[in-house]
């Protein structure tokens, strides 16, 4: 991943920051959303490609781990594609 490190990504998400990134020419946003984490794909037909509901009994670090390992990118997780990700902006 270019633009940040995975440990920093955990920190950004756990502190409520939105992370914009590109992957294979497409633009995405990863963000905390109340009781969930989401990934949005932007373009002509913007859509939520992943919504991970945080279980009540789950701590934040475990929830982020599970979210980043959800299969959202054509059968692959963020962790599986992260070497091809470029972080653009952290809000």
Regions found by a protein language model. Name each.
Residues 28-29:
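Short, isolated positions in well-ordered beta-strands
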Residues 1-22:
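Negatively charged, low-complexity tracts enriched in Asp/Glu with abundant Ser/Thr
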Residues 51-91:
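Mixed-charge, Lys/Arg-enriched low-complexity segments
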Residues 32-51:
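Short, surface-exposed, low-complexity cationic segments
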């Amino acid at each position: 991943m270019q633009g940040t490190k995975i440990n920093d990504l955990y920190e950004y998400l756990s502190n409520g920051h939105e992370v914009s990134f590109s992957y294979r020419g497409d633009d995405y946003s990863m963000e905390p959303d109340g009781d969930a984490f989401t990934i949005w794909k932007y373009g002509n037909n913007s859509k939520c490609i992943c919504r991970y509901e945080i279980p009540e009994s789950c701590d934040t670090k475990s929830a982020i781990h599970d979210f980043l390992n959800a299969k959202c990118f054509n059968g692959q997780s963020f962790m599986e594609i992260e070497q091809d990700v470029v972080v653009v902006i952290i809000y």
